[in-house]
């Protein structure tokens, strides 16, 4: 390889990398709705549509086991309490959206913040609330199975747009799973230098 080609290859790689990054930035800025729709379709709606409400309820239960284990190992820190508070609040908010799909309430465009447990709730209380909240979500999935909404029913998600009830169940499962990975035990926090 000549000296010229040794310089040329990294330059081409750098230009290509910058081009990909610029393209990603363009898509993120100007095509974010397209990206969001693709995410909703590929990560939420398509996998959820292949499952029955019974299977989604079972998935919520299975994911709940891992969720409760992570919460059980969590050290009593403000950061961990904040994560659990967020998970509980968002799941309760999602439950209200599922009740809209069941015809039990009218749609209200609100945020998840009012559904969060109040300040000063202990870690142990949050762990119990998490278990109760997930049990209610599983119950809603079973009720959806017993009385499925009409085909094509959607309920608005403030950030993701309209979701089917099955999409909502998958979203709640995935959200809690991803957020709970932020929980840290005492040993993990020390290893990470916190």
Each model region followed by its residue ranges:
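Short, helix-capping/interhelical loops that line the mouth of catalytic, cofactor-
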Residues: 23-54, 93-134, 150-151, 191-194
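Helix-loop segments that flank and shape redox-cofactor active sites
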Residues: 61-82, 103-110, 145-164, 192
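Short, flexible active-site recognition loops that position polar ligands and cofactors
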Residues: 162-173
């Amino acid at each position: 390889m000549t000296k010229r080609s040794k310089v040329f290859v990294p330059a081409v790689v750098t230009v290509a990398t910058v081009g990909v990054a610029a393209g990603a930035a363009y898509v993120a800025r100007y095509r974010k709705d397209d990206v969001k729709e693709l995410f909703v379709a590929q990560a939420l709606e398509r996998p959820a549509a292949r499952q029955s409400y019974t299977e989604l309820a079972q998935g919520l239960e299975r994911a709940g086991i891992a969720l409760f284990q992570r919460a059980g190992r969590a050290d009593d820190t403000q950061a961990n309490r904040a994560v659990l508070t967020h998970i509980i609040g968002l799941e309760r908010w999602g439950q209200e959206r599922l009740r809209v799909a069941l015809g039990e309430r009218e749609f209200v465009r609100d945020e998840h913040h009012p559904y969060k447990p109040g300040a000063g709730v202990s870690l142990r209380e949050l762990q119990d609330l998490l278990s109760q909240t997930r049990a209610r979500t599983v119950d809603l999935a079973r009720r959806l199975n017993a009385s499925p909404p009409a085909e094509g029913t959607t309920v608005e998600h403030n950030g993701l747009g309209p979701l089917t009830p099955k999409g909502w169940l998958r979203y709640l499962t995935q959200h809690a799973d991803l957020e709970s990975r932020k929980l840290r035990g005492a040993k993990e926090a020390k290893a990470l230098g916190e």
